[in-house]
UniProtKB/Swiss-Prot annotation:
Glutamine amide modification, residue list: 32
One GO-annotated biological process of the protein: defense response
Domain of life (superkingdom): Eukaryota
Localization per record: Secreted
Keywords: Amidation, Amphibian defense peptide, Antimicrobial, Secreted
Expression tissues: Expressed by the skin glands.
Assigned protein family: Belongs to the frog skin active peptide (FSAP) family. Dermatoxin subfamily.
Record-given protein name: Dermatoxin-J2
Length: 32
């Protein structure tokens, strides 16, 4: 169903966003 598909896409985007945020945080800490 479309709802399930969108939910899956949202989960994937959230996972990628978290990964990027973690990497960004590590870079900021390393730069200080």
């Amino acid at each position: 169903s479309l709802g399930g598909f969108l939910k899956g896409v949202g989960k994937a985007l959230a996972g990628v966003g978290k990964m990027v945020a973690d990497q960004f945080g590590n870079l900021l800490q390393a730069g200080q």
